[in-house]
């Protein structure tokens, strides 16, 4: 009997098969403040690879979508393994890669000898919970942005993803991850009630974790998202082979960072975490 892949909620299964969502994804996220913020962080953490490097560095892009992160990384000289469960999304990415290759061939640019060459992008259709086909130590770094980790249903499944990534990334490599904050619900209408319901349900149902929610999203009535507490995220990463270096608190609008928790600054809408493979 057919079953959905592990960690994939019903709404997520619908999402990854919607071609219109993939076709209009770039326009949808174009003005998303968090995309600008995470791009700035990536530029600092993964600034680029020069041609003088002995070999290219490989970045694992988890939930790569249409290449919003993969293409800028490749432009800085990184090779990228782009993993997504959505075939329509990967189709858009492949089209962009082919266009970029044609541009590189027909419009060569004069660059310094130590400037980075455009890296290779390797799209793979896969469930993030099931990455056993990727070899140990295949990547130097990894990114998991735009709340992709929260789209995975079940804490054990999310930990499985983190463990896979720790296995694939070489020791000393970096992970940059973005998630939504569970307690941001307190700033929303009815948020206290929804958090209470989620907590009670997490006690009575083995299929529900505190912070799980479904919501209407781009024509889908039950899109799944798990929202993390800071403690939960740090605990899970630490238990799965990662040393947490920095936890950055995003404003509710995701357009700026807040101060440290003890220094005030309001409730965070989400977190961007930088971690190192132990």
Residue map of PLM features:
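A short SAM/SAH-binding and catalytic strip from SAM-dependent methyltransferases
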Residues: 141-156
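A short glycine-rich, Lys/Arg-flanked "PGG" loop and its adjoining helix->strand segment in the class I
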Residues: 159-171
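Core SAM-dependent methyltransferase catalytic element
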Residues: 259-278
